[in-house]
From Swiss-Prot:
CDD domains: TrpRS_core. The gene is trpS. Belongs to the class-I aminoacyl-tRNA synthetase family. L-tryptophan binds at residue 134. This is Tryptophan--tRNA ligase. It catalyses: tRNA(Trp) + L-tryptophan + ATP = L-tryptophyl-tRNA(Trp) + AMP + diphosphate + H(+). ATP binds at residues 10-12, 18-19, 146-148, 186, 195-199. A motif ('KMSKS' region) lies at residues 195-199. A motif ('HIGH' region) lies at residues 11-19. Its EC number is 6.1.1.2. It comes from Rickettsia conorii (strain ATCC VR-613 / Malish 7).
Length: 330
């Protein structure tokens, strides 16, 4: 029997190169080997202020990128989180056994809430519990995530343990965390210490998957490096050039040593020019397919409804199992 893999991307804003290299590119490889559930995290998206029209468009955009990048809806289950009501039902049950102190230790809440945490919504605070429900409801064996989500996955494992100990029975599977070595943490093109993000004010901090070729060339040309005139890799002392090397390696599948050797006696200009071309070679087919899919909303909706119907079968089984243990009438 194939192991179950689950992962998702938040449906806010345009997806970028970091989303592709950190998640979607790896998912495409995994779909042949695993029973995969890939969702659009639209419930998580409303933990921050977002316009209804923007949310609706983002859901379609993320789905179109999933498909354009190579996810096959005949091989994997693709769905919007909000279309499977069991996610929120299980999240409530998990909320009722999760100690408040565990959530207070979550660093992402502090980062996203900013300086005035009293004004942050409860949904943002309990975000990790909904994330735990997203994972545990499908009894996922493996959850591929970026390094920044590792703390949330540890919480998920802890919550599963609480439920299993409470009822002295292995009801929820404790998932394994999968963090791949390359591409999981692509940094900003303007600051090598910050993760590439949809929320960054500067559009030149990221390569959006729908950027045209000229804009990609401009962004890479203006990408921050440092005062040294040679290519080398050191994340601590040279974070910006190291980030560009990570991108190059992830897309070309050449080792860092090979790439550095190729540009040993050349400056940044040639390296950046070649990097831009490699990015374009990888992203142009995705962008072309994405634009085609965005013109067929009826097809996209069909994929979402089909995926949600399939996901609900698995999700409802888990929720009923947990509810029965709590003592609810099923």
């Amino acid at each position: 029997m194939k192991k179950t893999v689950l992962s998702g991307v938040q449906a806010t804003g345009s997806l970028h190169l970091g989303n592709y290299l950190g998640a979607i590119k790896n998912w495409v490889k995994m779909q042949e080997e695993y029973n995969c559930f890939f969702f659009l995290a639209d419930l998580h998206a409303i933990t921050v202020d977002i316009k209804p029209s923007e949310l609706n468009n983002s859901i379609m955009e993320v789905l179109a990128v999933y498909l354009a990048a190579g996810l096959n809806p005949d091989k994997v289950t693709i769905f919007a989180q909000s279309m499977v009501k069991e996610h929120t039902e299980l999240a409530w049950l998990l909320n009722c056994v999760t100690p408040l102190g565990w959530l207070k230790r979550m660093t992402q809440f502090k980062d996203k809430a900013g300086s005035d945490q009293e004004k942050a919504c409860l949904g943002l605070f309990s975000y990790p519990v909904l994330m735990a429900a997203d994972i545990l409801i499908y009894k996922a064996d493996i959850v591929p995530v970026g390094e920044d989500q590792k703390q949330h996955l540890e919480l998920t494992r802890d919550i599963a343990g609480v439920i299993n100990r409470k009822f002295n029975k292995e009801i929820l599977k404790v998932p394994e965390v999968l963090i791949s070595e390359t591409g999981t943490r692509i940094m900003s093109l303007r600051d090598g210490l910050k993760k590439m993000s949809k929320s960054d004010i500067s559009d030149f901090s990221r390569i959006n998957l729908k950027d045209d070729n000229d804009l990609i060339h401009q962004k890479i040309k203006k990408a921050k490096t440092d005062h040294l005139s040679f290519v080398s890799y050191d994340q601590e002392t040279r974070p910006e050039i190291s980030n560009l090397l990570d991108i190059y390696s992830s897309l070309s599948e050449e080792s860092l040593e090979q790439i550095i050797g190729n540009y040993q006696n050349q400056g940044f200009a040639k390296f950046k020019e070649d990097l831009a071309e490699i990015i374009i070679t990888n992203l142009q087919p995705i962008r072309d397919k994405y634009l085609e899919l965005m013109n067929d909303k009826e097809y996209l909706l069909k994929i979402l409804h089909k995926g949600a119907e399939k996901a609900r079968i698995r999700a409802s089984e888990t929720v009923n199992e947990v509810k029965e243990q709590f003592g609810f009438v099923i």
